[in-house]
Swiss-Prot record:
This is Orexigenic neuropeptide QRFP. Its main location: secreted. Stimulates feeding and grooming behavior, metabolic rate and locomotor activity and increases blood pressure. May have orexigenic activity. May promote aldosterone secretion by the adrenal gland. Residues 18-79 form a propeptide. Expressed in the brain with highest expression levels in the hypothalamus and optic nerve. Also expressed in the trachea and mammary gland. Ligand for the G-protein coupled receptor QRFPR/GPR103. Keywords: Amidation, Neuropeptide, Pyrrolidone carboxylic acid, Secreted, Signal. Residues 1-17 form the signal peptide. It comes from Rattus norvegicus (Rat). GO terms for biological process: grooming behavior; locomotory behavior; neuropeptide signaling pathway; positive regulation of blood pressure; regulation of feeding behavior.
């Protein structure tokens, strides 16, 4: 009885490695079950895999993902060579601080002109 149990313990992981070819139909990927037999699998013959993606297709997918990320980030812009990055965000003499940029700054980053600048709120 002990010998039977040890054989079952050895064969159980082995059965997990090999798919049940006779029970699977033509729904297998690449129809491996119809083309390969147990003898060929045990001899080390590997079934031909489905055609791997081409490198050009992978580049196209990567570029599409980058483009979709740019759409989701809103108005994040790349670097601009002319001037400092912060000059576009500071109000000029002719522009009031209560313009659309000022109200947006108040709403998003708790900027308050009454308090005299930025205030950091912890816990929110």
């Amino acid at each position: 009885m002990r010998c039977l149990c040890s054989w079952l313990c050895l064969l159980l992981p082995l059965s997990a490695c090999f798919p049940l070819l006779d029970r699977r139909g033509p729904t297998d990927i690449g129809d491996i079950g119809a083309r390969m037999s147990w003898v060929q699998l045990t001899e080390g013959h590997t079934p031909r895999s489905v055609q791997s993606p081409r490198p050009q297709a992978l580049l196209v997918v990567a570029k599409e993902q980058q483009a979709s990320r740019r759409e989701h980030t809103g108005f994040r812009l790349g670097r601009q060579d002319s001037g400092s990055e912060a000059t576009g965000f500071l109000p000029t003499d002719s522009e009031k601080a209560s313009g659309p940029l000022g109200t947006l700054a108040e709403e998003l980053s708790s900027y308050s002109r009454r308090k005299g600048g930025f205030s950091f709120r912890f816990g929110r």
